[in-house]
């Protein structure tokens, strides 16, 4: 198109001269120029599409920091403030965290361990996986009744290495999650295992399993949920990004959704703020590569 040719070369030749050569009017060229979206406007529109695609990929869970991180991971050069502005203009808002609820019962006669972990939660990029695990239990409402979820989380990468679901809060629920973690990760002796003082974690069977793996047992102080803040934070994420928007009729419906959330979304796709917006699986892989050790293989 002649107008487009003039636009491409207007820095080299006078507009009037090019209009005469191409037999178009100067007023016609400038009218065309006003009707053509600027490069900035075209970029804005493309970014709007990309931002919405990432937001929808997250099922409406991501706020602007994680949308920005995902766009950068895809090779998009864009500032966080621009992403936040575009999301605001499009009415896209991430889900906000609510206060979490205590589920385990610490009223029992089993012995409890001291708080060895002592809130040392910081992620160390030079660290080694499977040095510290945190365990906890939450409950999930369905129309059929409660479904309970127990998890074991690796503190180095925030990866959920073991989990179990059941209809009761018996010790076997926590034991099944721990067994999964052990089979998947094969931790070395000296693993530090932290939990609250719930009866499931203080029980003889659970403690025997830890002792058999030569693990060091650590427990939160009585009534202090902040001593197990990483596990509590994971459950707050589950609640805000999954549970609060669902109305499951059966426990089996909830089981399927929770499995997908933990294994597919949280471990492998969700970008974690404390991991510099990498996924737990990505961060875990980097830690193993830095340690020059093979990734653990399940039995």
Language-model regions: role of each:
Residues 1-299:
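Charged DNA-binding/catalytic regions of mobile-element recombinases
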